[in-house]
């Protein structure tokens, strides 16, 4: 543990030196042959909802962030995926209907999820050297089979709009010789993730259960369980190439949180985890995630003791906190630091662990 804290301090000092010399934050090329699971990036909580700081979603992407977050609702009347924080029947966000990169910073906002994903794809294609982007989707009210808004249709939807920029579960499973690991867990523990540099201009999508479905539905029907079962079924049928996203386990902690799922056959289909940053650091031993090459997303970076401002800490403090969480094994560090000077941390990509 002491060694990890020393490493965090060294990373923080390094970050300060970078800032002092006005050098850009680390990019994928600076990390040698590190895989996606061996780096830590910084992201923006509820990216779609920060219209005052980011008039358009592309403005947030322009910061060099490694993670954006979208909240989506299955609209029970229209059968469309809305993107908003609290409106289940309409979209309220900074996404536009873009067809080219020239459209990303103009036009009507408040579009549905398809347009948000289009914006991301178009931006990534216009920035092919940019480091990989994690797209975190909170599915507020989950899937809705009665409307056909199920994992199968969601796969097709995501693939249609992210296209060739998407890194999929099948990509993780596939070895260099073309053969495949039997499940995501085995592939992750073998560190079969692509090199971070090779994923420049690519997106990885994780989905998490939404606050609404957690409040009203039994855990057995949440999107994490439903999608893991979907992955298992696709693999058994030999059609895993159809899968588009990675289900994430909420509440990452020192002990494997997948044990909460009563069906142990689903466990190998979870390799992405989500945690509160304060709880993550407080657990004291989260190296298990790093050692097994699982991806981890930690939220509310400001809330680790000593707590920082949730919106505008000094750049020095923000960089030190990101370095601390990277040393503690976080893959993606989600923040609300969207104003200067703290937003200077958003483009940082550090060595993990």
Feature-to-residue mapping (PLM):
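Secretory targeting and sorting signals
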Residues: 1-28
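Catalytic cores of phosphodiester-bond hydrolases, prominently lipid phosphodiesterases
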Residues: 29-353
């Amino acid at each position: 543990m002491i060694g990890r804290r020393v490493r965090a301090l060294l990373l923080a000092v390094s970050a300060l030196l970078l800032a002092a010399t006005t050098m850009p934050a680390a990019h994928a090329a600076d990390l040698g042959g590190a895989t996606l699971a061996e780096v830590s990036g910084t992201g923006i909580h509820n990216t779609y909802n920060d219209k005052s700081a980011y008039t358009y979603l592309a403005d947030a992407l322009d910061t060099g962030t490694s993670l954006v977050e979208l909240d989506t609702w299955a609209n029970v009347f229209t059968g469309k995926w809305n993107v908003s924080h609290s409106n289940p029947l309409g979209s309220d966000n900074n996404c536009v209907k873009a067809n080219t990169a020239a459209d990303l910073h103009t036009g009507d906002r408040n579009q549905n999820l398809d347009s948000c994903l289009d914006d991301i794809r178009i931006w990534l294609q216009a920035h092919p050297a940019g480091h990989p982007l994690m797209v975190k989707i909170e599915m507020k009210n989950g899937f809705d089979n009665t409307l056909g808004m199920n994992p199968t249709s969601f796969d097709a939807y995501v693939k249609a709009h992210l296209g060739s920029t998407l890194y999929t579960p099948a990509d993780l499973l596939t070895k260099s010789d073309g053969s495949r690991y039997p499940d995501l867990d085995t592939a992750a523990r073998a560190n079969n993730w692509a090199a971070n540099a090779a994923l420049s201009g690519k997106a990885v999508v994780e989905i998490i259960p939404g606050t609404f479905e957690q409040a009203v539905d039994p855990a057995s029907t949440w999107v994490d369980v439903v999608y893991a079962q979907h992955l298992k079924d696709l693999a058994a049928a030999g059609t895993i190439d159809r899968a588009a996203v990675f289900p994430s386990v909420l509440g990452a902690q020192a002990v494997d949180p997948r044990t909460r799922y009563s069906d142990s056959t689903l466990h190998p289909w979870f390799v992405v985890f989500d945690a509160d940053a304060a709880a993550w650091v407080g657990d004291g031993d989260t190296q298990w995630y790093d050692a097994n090459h699982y991806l981890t997303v930690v939220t509310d970076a400001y809330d680790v003791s000593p707590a920082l401002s949730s919106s505008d800490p000094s750049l020095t403090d923000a960089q030190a906190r990101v370095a601390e969480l990277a040393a503690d094994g976080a893959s993606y560090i989600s923040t609300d630091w969207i104003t200067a000077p703290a937003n200077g941390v958003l483009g940082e990509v550090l060595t993990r662990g």
